[in-house]
């Protein structure tokens, strides 16, 4: 919608651009279905109206799904939400990754590999390093990354750990890789408890 408004007629652009996003959506949604699509401004208003009404409908569906997720996750994994930085969306992504098959998660190392946070050796000469794992479930990897970002910004023990690792010469991507592995280790028992029941 922003691109369409940016290329719209100057009068329409002047009316819509200063509005806050939510007000702009409702304003565009109110555009009539009967706009004259043969005129450029009418066609733009028609397209903006269609897009805005679709956005509002999708927003209603997202809200309903978020409400369902907020009810299901605490029942499926009551202790998972106690892990610092794990919210409803993150817990949902981790639960989907864990699935209902506990046999595929034999250990926390197997869970880490499933999430793509197991270290991959990338040593050269006298330097011992590990690189990011590009495999595994990308949604779970992203969920662990979000937890790591929350912890790096608000969790003092994690911030202290990152400062210590930085002083040792580690780069930020290496620190995040290590944190994701630790978080996977911390989350695993909560998921295992869920899948064992």
Language-model segments: which ranges?
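A detector of single, family-specific signature residues
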Residues: 1-197
């Amino acid at each position: 919608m922003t691109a369409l408004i940016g290329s719209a007629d100057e009068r329409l652009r002047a009316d819509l651009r200063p509005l806050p996003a939510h007000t702009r959506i409702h304003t565009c949604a109110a555009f009539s279905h009967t706009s004259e699509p043969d005129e450029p401004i009418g066609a733009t208003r028609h397209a903006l109206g269609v897009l805005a009404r679709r956005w509002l409908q999708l927003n209603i569906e997202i809200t309903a799904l978020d409400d369902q997720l907020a009810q299901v996750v605490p029942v499926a994994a009551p202790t998972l939400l106690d892990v610092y930085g794990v919210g409803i969306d993150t817990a949902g992504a981790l639960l989907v990754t864990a699935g209902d098959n506990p046999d595929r998660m034999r250990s926390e190392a197997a869970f880490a590999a499933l999430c793509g946070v197991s270290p991959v050796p990338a040593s050269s000469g006298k330097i011992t390093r590990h690189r990011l794992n590009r495999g595994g479930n990308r949604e779970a990897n992203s969920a662990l990354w979000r937890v790591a970002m929350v912890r790096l910004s608000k969790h003092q023990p994690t911030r202290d750990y990152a400062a210590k690792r930085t002083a040792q010469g580690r780069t930020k991507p290496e620190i995040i890789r290590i944190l994701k592995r630790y978080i996977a280790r911390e989350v695993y028992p909560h998921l295992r408890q869920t899948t064992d029941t």
